[in-house]
Amino acid sequence: NTGPVIVIDGAGRVTLDGGGVRRILYMNTCDPELVWTTDHCDDQDHPRLTLQNLTFAHGNATGTAPDGGGAVFARGGRLKVVNSRFENNICDPLGPDVGGAALRAFDQSGDLPLYIVGSTFGGAPGRGNSCSNGGALSASGVSYTVLNSDLSYNDAAGNGANPPQPGTPGGGSGGANYNHGNTFHLTVCG
C-alpha cells in the first residue's frame, strides 16, 4: 500500500502463476497488520488497484482464511480488472458461501462497483476455474459491472445449496458468478 493508485500492467506478456499451491494476489484493507485510514476498514478509498493485460493461472485458495479467491482476493479499496485472463484457479470445492475461484471481493469503498472489462474467466475446455460457489466470481456486498467479458467453462462444484440443506456440505451456486448480501447490483453487457 505505497500509494492510492496502483496499476499492475502485464502488457499481455505476464502470467502470474500460483503453481497450484497458493493464492496469487491478496488485497485486504481490513488486515490487522495494515494501517487503517478510516473508522471502518472497508471504507478506505485506497488502494485503487487496476489489474490489466495479465494472466492469472493455477491459483489455489483451498483451506485458506479468508476463503475463496483462488487467484485474487480483494476487500476494501477499489479493484478493476481489464483485458486479463483467469485460468485453472481453484478454491474449496464444498461449503456454503465459499466462492470465487478466480476472484472474490468483499466491500468496495463507497459501495461502488467492481469493474471487469474485456476479460476471460475460463473461456475454453480445460481452462475453467472451480470452487464451491461462483466458479469464476464471488462477491459479498459488492456490485459487479462486467463488460465485454467471457465467463465460460467454470464450475460451482459444491452441492446442497446455500445455506446448506441438512446432510449436505452446501454450495453449488453460480458456475460463473455467485453474489450475496443485502444490496448489490450485477450488470453484464457485451
Which positions does each model-derived feature cover?
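Right-handed parallel beta-helix
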Residues: D9-R13, H46-N60, R78-D92, G110-G128, ...
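Ordered hydrophobic segments in well-structured contexts
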Residues: A71, G99-A102, Y115, N133, ...
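Extracellular beta-strand-rich solenoid/capping regions of secreted or surface-exposed proteins
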Residues: N1-V7, T15-Q52, N60-R78, P96-D97, ...
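Short glycine/acidic-rich loop motifs that flank beta-strands on beta-rich extracellular proteins
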Residues: G18-R22, N60-D67, I90-G99, P125-G135, ...
